[in-house]
């Protein structure tokens, strides 16, 4: 389903500095002048693959530094030229590229995104502030775009949550975490209870629980979004910023 991009109405309040302050947060969230805004759809995945924005040729940032990727241990950073573990190489998504809670109404994380439909590398390493609709109204999720894909619709966002389902790339997590596979649950959708998060490698369990705790196990929530400056906390993890 295509989503029409519409003007965004924020739940956050404007600080005197022109930044966006989450309801009970201290971090300043600064909008990008002329940046994207609208409404979008969401879903989840965790396929362990090297993300699209980790390839230098897909990057158009001031430093031309792509998203960091890691060796099979999920921790040791590898060169950007190393092939993805999902197609026979030895480069995987780093285990620290998981969502994390800032406070009761704000979280930081990462996403695969498209704003044109299909593969869209133009906004690699940009950040979007997502404001939840419906049951999660009052909460926000600030994500950095680190991946994209041919199966994405226009203005859609897919969040990498461990145990979120491997999707079309079924081999990466199996190879990275054998004998204790990190796929978890169904190919699409992943685990269906917080208790199943304990079946994942320990380093991935916090990101799995995030879905059930901060997101209250709401599947595929609708969001409004606005492009914002990437917080230092996110850039320190990905090593990339637009």
Swiss-Prot record:
The lineage's top-level taxon is: Eukaryota
Annotated keywords: Carbohydrate metabolism, Cellulose degradation, Digestion, Glycoprotein, Glycosidase, Hydrolase, Polysaccharide degradation, Secreted, Signal
Q: Which reaction does it catalyse?
A: Endohydrolysis of (1->4)-beta-D-glucosidic linkages in cellulose, lichenin and cereal beta-D-glucans
- Primary localization class, coarse: secreted
Tell me where in or outside the cell this protein is found: Secreted
Keyword Transcription regulation on entry: no
Name the GO terms of the biological process aspect.
cellulose catabolic process; digestion
Q: Which SUPFAM superfamilies match?
A: Barwin-like endoglucanases
Active site at 47
Q: Molecular function (GO) terms listed? A: cellulase activity
Question: What is known about the tissue distribution of this protein?
Answer: Expressed in larval carcasses and gut, and adult gut.
One Pfam family, short name:
Glyco_hydro_45
Q: How is this protein named in the record?
A: Endoglucanase
